[in-house]
């Protein structure tokens, strides 16, 4: 990836995950600037050689003006204030990337009228361990070099996929943005069940986390096999696995998952109207 000067507005967990992922790939730290009001976060980043500024309007505006790329890594309710503070900046020759949930490209364009090159990103928390999944959307006018740069940027912390319709970002939210929590809940339930069977907590956690990791790896390493086939391959008729799956099917697990993901989509749609 050809390095560009990047200014991050916000230095929270997701911003740090991206920054540290870039640094691990050899991205020059002096090409990265972070604006954040938290002194401890700035210190942590500065120790890695990253430029930092306090979140004052003047310092932030100066940092953005001298950068080729602006990456908005703040909560969606802060977007309006952040963009207002950058109203004097000319974005016509800059790439703007937003990881603020629920903030549409159209809304960003209205907040930053001179910005013509905008990418909306929905990352997820496994980016913190370089195993993230990010959905990306941009209008057709996005320059190819900016599209590639954004993809490379997010690939530093996992995998990426592009959608051609912004409405699909709601589905991305259900499929990857929020989905780590679904897996955490299922793993939590398994751990609790084992503990109720007199398994100690540490051993129960080990059994669950390694089984989850192994199952995910089998899916990844067998791309031509449907996930259903992998399930069928470990389910012997009349066996222990079949007994467990019968209960899950009786409780309509698949229907519950579908309902949960639909609720996620609907809430994402509602949030987009708020910001």
Swiss-Prot record:
A Pfam entry, by short name: P5CR_dimer
UniProt KW keywords: Amino-acid biosynthesis, Cytoplasm, NADP, Oxidoreductase, Proline biosynthesis
Domain of life: Bacteria
SUPFAM superfamilies: 6-phosphogluconate dehydrogenase C-terminal domain-like, NAD(P)-binding Rossmann-fold domains
GO CC annotation, single: cytoplasm
Gene3D superfamilies the record matches: NAD(P)-binding Rossmann-like Domain, ProC C-terminal domain-like
Reaction it catalyzes: L-proline + NADP(+) = (S)-1-pyrroline-5-carboxylate + NADPH + 2 H(+); L-proline + NAD(+) = (S)-1-pyrroline-5-carboxylate + NADH + 2 H(+)
Subcellular location: Cytoplasm
GO biological process assignments: L-proline biosynthetic process
Role noted for this protein: Catalyzes the reduction of 1-pyrroline-5-carboxylate (PCA) to L-proline.
The name this protein goes by in its record: Pyrroline-5-carboxylate reductase
Lineage: Bacteria, Pseudomonadati, Pseudomonadota, Gammaproteobacteria, Pasteurellales
């Amino acid at each position: 990836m050809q390095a560009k000067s990047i200014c991050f507005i916000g230095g929270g967990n997701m911003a740090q995950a991206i920054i540290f992922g870039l640094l691990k790939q050899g991205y020059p730290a002096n090409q990265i600037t972070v604006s954040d009001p938290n002194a401890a976060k700035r210190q942590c980043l500065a120790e890695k050689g990253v430029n930092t500024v306090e979140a004052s309007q003047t310092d932030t505006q100066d940092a953005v003006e001298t950068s080729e790329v602006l990456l908005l890594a703040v909560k969606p309710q802060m977007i309006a204030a952040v963009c207002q503070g950058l109203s004097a900046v000319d974005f016509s020759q800059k790439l703007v990337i937003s990881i603020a949930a629920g903030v549409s490209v159209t809304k960003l364009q209205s907040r930053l009228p001179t910005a013509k090159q905008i990418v909306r990103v929905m990352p997820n928390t496994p980016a913190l361990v370089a195993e993230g999944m990010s959905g990306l959307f941009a209008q057709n006018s996005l320059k190819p070099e900016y599209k590639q740069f954004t993809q490379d940027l997010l690939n530093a912390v996992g995998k990426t996929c592009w959608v051609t319709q912004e409405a699909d970002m709601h589905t991305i939210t259900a499929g990857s943005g929020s989905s780590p929590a679904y897996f955490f809940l299922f793993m939590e339930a398994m751990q609790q069940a084992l503990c109720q069977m007199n398994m100690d907590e540490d051993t129960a956690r080990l059994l669950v986390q390694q089984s989850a990791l192994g199952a995910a790896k089998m899916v990844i390493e067998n791309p031509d096999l449907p996930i259903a086939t992998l399930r069928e391959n470990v389910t012997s008729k009349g066996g222990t696995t079949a007994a467990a799956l019968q209960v899950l099917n009786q409780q309509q697990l698949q229907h519950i998952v579908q309902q949960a993901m639909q609720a996620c989509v609907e809430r994402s749609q509602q949030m987009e109207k708020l910001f």
